[in-house]
Amino acid sequence: MSSLVTPQHAEELSTGARQLGVELTAEQHEKLLGYLALLIKWNKAYNLTAVRDPDEMVSRHLLDSLSVMSFIHNDRDNWLDVGSGGGMPGIPLAILHPHKRVTVLDANGKKTRFLTQVKMELKLDNLTVIHSRVEAFQPAQPFDGIISRAFSSMENFTNWTRHLGDTGTQWLAMKGLHPADELVALPADFTVESEQALTVPGCQGQRHLLILRRKA
């Protein structure tokens, strides 16, 4: 274990994952802690996250990402994390689902360099890192799932990514407060399939997940 990661961090991750109903293998637990160590190390120079205290990163980043894993269904193999930043939730998604293809996209070169380092050090062969604005990204095929965490408004999220999916794609938007005002501006061809209030161990404040589909 890296000197940047403490036994308390390891225990908080194990306990929090169990509370979320996520059973981590020893390898997944080790890789998540390895990711945490890289995040702590690189954040000092690269400003990857506004969370500066390593003791807050387990709950506010790792467990927050794990809180949506029960909504990542087995029949969806090709996922995109838009505006991934420091890699949440894309890196935990790739660690927990090694047989799914996960693409993490960000327009910030420093952040994609960090994500490339994570891919290399943790040997995440199922992870693809893309340095691009989301509007300019042109994948070879639609994604099965598109997820974002604190990326933009619901209107922008759907408009900027509509070309990356089709009517079979699920869009997952991770939010803090329920974005009722943002849903008013949701494009007419998108519909809300499900709204979930989430409880994240160690996190204060509200968490919500909205699952959307495109009608046409």
Swiss-Prot record:
One of its GO terms (cellular component) is cytosol. It catalyses: guanosine(527) in 16S rRNA + S-adenosyl-L-methionine = N(7)-methylguanosine(527) in 16S rRNA + S-adenosyl-L-homocysteine. Disulfide bonds: none annotated. Gene3D superfamilies: Vaccinia Virus protein VP39. The keyword Nucleotide-binding does not apply. It holds the Pfam family GidB. Its EC number is 2.1.1.170. GO terms for molecular function: rRNA (guanine-N7-)-methyltransferase activity. S-adenosyl-L-methionine binds at G83, M88, V134, E135, R149. It is found in: Cytoplasm. Keywords: Cytoplasm, Methyltransferase, rRNA processing, S-adenosyl-L-methionine, Transferase. The keyword Nucleotide-binding does not apply. It comes from the Bacteria. Specifically methylates the N7 position of guanine in position 527 of 16S rRNA. Belongs to the methyltransferase superfamily. RNA methyltransferase RsmG family. This is Ribosomal RNA small subunit methyltransferase G. The gene is rsmG.
